[in-house]
A protein has these predicted regions:
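Extracytoplasmic beta-sandwich strand-turn segments characteristic of Greek-key/jelly-roll folds
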Residues: 68, 73-75, 99-131, 246-279, ...
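Histidine- and aromatic-rich segments of cupredoxin/plastocyanin-like copper-binding domains
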Residues: 106-107, 115-118, 186-324, 407-410
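Hydrophobic or amphipathic alpha-helical targeting/insertion segments
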Residues: 129-158
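N-terminal secretory signal peptides and thylakoid transit peptides that target proteins
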Residues: 1-16
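Extended terminal and domain-junction accessory segments
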Residues: 11, 19-43, 147-179, 255-390, ...
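Asparagine-centered strand-capping/turn motif at beta-strand->loop junctions
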Residues: 85-89, 226-227, 383-387
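Active/binding-pocket-proximal capping segment
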Residues: 240-251, 386-414, 446-450, 458-460
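N-terminal edge beta-strand
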Residues: 56-74, 201-211, 349-375
Length: 460
């Protein structure tokens, strides 16, 4: 249900007002808290940060911690993540933990799971992390601007037991809406929002254009690729003297298989590769189709060459009962017209699910879920893309299993939280509705989401 700010302040203890100077020298700090009585393990501060995306020019970004994308958070599977989030931005915000199966009150959706964290306030996020893998965190408020300015960061959940990988790297892929002088360009343009989404112009890895990542020669290295972009789908491939295998998709392990053709990595999606690094001095191009994103450079390493690790252990996700599952249809549609926004900042309605366009300015939208699921019951969602543009469909709070598609041969079904639904594609995904609450279900092309392609699904 939706609620007022007064109701939320009476019902939650996580939201607290602090002075804008809170944190002192730790203004951009993300780090381990040593005080056992602090009630949290990490402090994470969102604040303005000057970055140099274009050489010789300064861009006024927003960041979680001292870098954009934000500093990597790490936690071990099955343990608690306790983060005190402090807002030093000029606008309100939240943190959504993308892909994590957690309680509703920790999900970071304004007026659904919590109130927005206003400037000068902090909020304590606390939840147990059930699944290992590559995840990320970002706001769910003013998303085009806040994610576009740099408020994104990786969350890595380490397996309970060692995996056999001795070396690993996290590569955060993001394009930036900046011009040749590093100045901001529009994060969302209606003409582009009605198509593939408003793309950025500068491609970076870990916040750097033309990035070079050094990797140990002769080793099999775990490389986590995270698409933290607002709109862009990367066609991931490698060019060079190397062999690569896919070990996990969107945090969830798969049977290791070669990376062959382009892997289409949509916004919000992640892929875990194992790459056998060649001899020292050799280079591998990480590419988006034919476009080089960055360089992987082999450097001298004293260790003996490593072998391919075994498959990663599966996450503890409930298997859906396909024989007795209830089937539901969800159609991603063009709204049929370009409506005019209002003076209150309401974006146009361009997209809809099952004939309903989400209004991000309406705080009561979640009171009208597009579907209500019974807790513990299995469901098969028929996802139909009735448009000419692809949509990475993301579900909060639960994982689903991809079991069929009219465009892809699903040889090995896999669990995920985000599925890239191609143009005119019809796909089937299955899940157990095991997490009570009202959960967002939306396209992760951000200006598709903000112009209607979002809904609420309730589990009761």
């Amino acid at each position: 249900m939706s609620f007022t700010r007064r109701q939320m302040l009476k019902g939650l203890t996580g939201l607290v007002v602090v002075g804008l100077g809170a944190g002192g020298a730790a203004r951009y700090w993300l780090g381990k808290v040593e005080d056992d009585n602090a009630g949290h393990d990490y402090e994470l501060i969102a604040a303005p940060l000057d970055v140099e995306l274009v050489p010789g020019h300064t861009t006024q970004a927003w960041a979680f911690g001292p870098s954009a994308p934000g500093t990597e958070l790490r936690v071990r599977q099955g343990t608690w993540l306790r983060v005190r989030f402090i807002n030093h931005l000029p606008i309100e915000t939240t943190i959504h933990w993308h892909g994590i199966r957690l309680p509703l009150e920790m999900d970071g959706v304004p007026y659904v799971s919590q109130l927005p964290v206003k400037p000068g306030e902090y909020f304590d996020y606390k939840f147990r992390v059930p699944d290992a893998g590559s995840y990320w965190y970002h706001p769910h408020v003013s998303s085009s601007e806040e994610l576009g300015r740099g408020l994104v960061g990786p969350l890595i959940v380490e397996e309970r037991e060692p995996t056999g990988f001795k070396h690993e790297r996290t590569l955060n892929l993001k394009t930036w809406h900046v011009d040749e002088q590093g100045g901001w360009m529009p994060f969302s343009v209606p003409r582009e929002a009605a198509r593939n989404g408003t793309a950025g112009r500068l491609i970076t890895i870990n916040g750097q254009a033309d990035a070079v990542t050094e990797l140990p020669a002769g080793q099999v290295v775990r490389v986590r690729l995270l698409n933290l972009d607002n709109t862009w789908t990367y066609r991931i491939n490698l060019k060079g003297n190397c062999e690569a295998r896919i070990y996990a998709l969107d945090g969830n392990p798969v049977t290791p298989r070669p990376l062959e053709d382009d892997y289409w990595l949509g916004p919000g999606m992640r892929i875990c590769l194992a790459i056998r690094i060649p001899e020292a001095g050799e280079e591998i191009s990480l590419r988006d189709g034919f476009v080089r994103l960055g360089t992987l450079r082999a450097v001298a390493n004293p260790d003996a060459p490593s072998d391919w690790p075994a498959a990663l252990p599966p996450n503890p996700i409930a298997e859906p009962d396909l024989q007795n599952a209830e089937k539901l249809n969800f159609n991603s549609e063009w709204a049929g017209k370009v409506s005019v926004g209002t003076d209150q900042g309401k974006p146009p309605s361009l997209w809809q699910i099952n004939g309903q366009a989400w209004d991000i300015t309406d705080k009561t939208c979640a009171d009208r879920p597009i579907a209500t699921l019974t807790k513990g019951k299995s469901y098969i969602f028929e996802l139909k893309n009735m448009t000419q543009y692809q949509h990475p469909i993301h579900l909060h709070g639960m994982s689903f299993k991809v079991i069929g598609s009219n465009r892809h041969d699903i040889k090995e079904p896999w669990f995920t939280d985000t599925y890239l639904l191609g143009k005119n594609e019809r796909a089937q995904v299955a899940l157990v509705a095991d997490n009570p609450g009202t959960w967002m279900f939306h396209c992760h092309v951000i200006d598709h989401m903000e112009t209607g392609l979002m809904a609420a699904i309730a589990v009761v």
